[in-house]
Amino acid sequence: TSEAVKSFAHDERVVLIQPTRNDLGIGGCWDVAIRSAQCGRYAVQLDSDDLYSSPQTLQRIVDAFHQQHAAMVIGSYRMVNFDLETLPPGLIAHAEWTASNGRNNALRINGLGAPRAFRTDVLRKIGFPNTSYGEDYALGLAFSRHYRIARIFDELYLCRRWDGNSDAALSIEKQNKNNLYKD
């Protein structure tokens, strides 16, 4: 990832933050980034093998923060292969998560959706857990206790799947371990 970011080094809007510690999981790396003075008003997820589905994705997220008066925004994504061909089940919108079901409806689903975006001022108060699985789910639950989580049910993100994905073709033992962490 750092090599890809370095290819954009000429663009002053791009900032590469490299943790100096070597004991950090994904959440720990996020935490270093959001505590940097260079981190802006919002922090938005983009996994290294995934893509935003349009040039308007980030603007739509910022608009949702304002229109829905939220501290966190979660979009919807489409499963694709590396040729960007849709894979089953296609669009993952978590349409069962609605305002009428309550803000803690996240407890009833096995994932929050993507991309996930956070208001940085709130995120710095909560902090990312230093783990490499479920760090975003833990934050979603923490945010939902006190803040509104906005939803965008249209596709914003392309989630590319391949055999080496951290959550591809998991054994039942690994699924149970992951679900225990979420519990």
Kindly label every feature range from the protein language model.
Residues 40-51:
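Short beta-strand-to-loop acidic/aromatic patch adjacent to the donor-nucleotide binding site
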Residues 132-139:
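Acidic donor-binding loop at a coil-to-helix junction in glycosyltransferase catalytic cores
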Residues 76, 150-156:
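Catalytic beta-strand/loop signature of glycosyltransferases that borders the donor
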Residues 96-117:
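A recurrent flexible, glycine/aromatic-enriched loop bordering the glycosyltransferase active site
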Residues 39-40, 111-126:
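Conserved nucleotide-sugar donor-binding
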Residues 56-89:
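Conserved donor NDP-sugar-binding/catalytic core segment of glycosyltransferases
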Residues 20-38:
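Glycine-rich, basic loop-to-helix element that forms the pyrophosphate-binding segment
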Residues 1-18:
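Acidic donor-binding segment of Leloir-type glycosyltransferases
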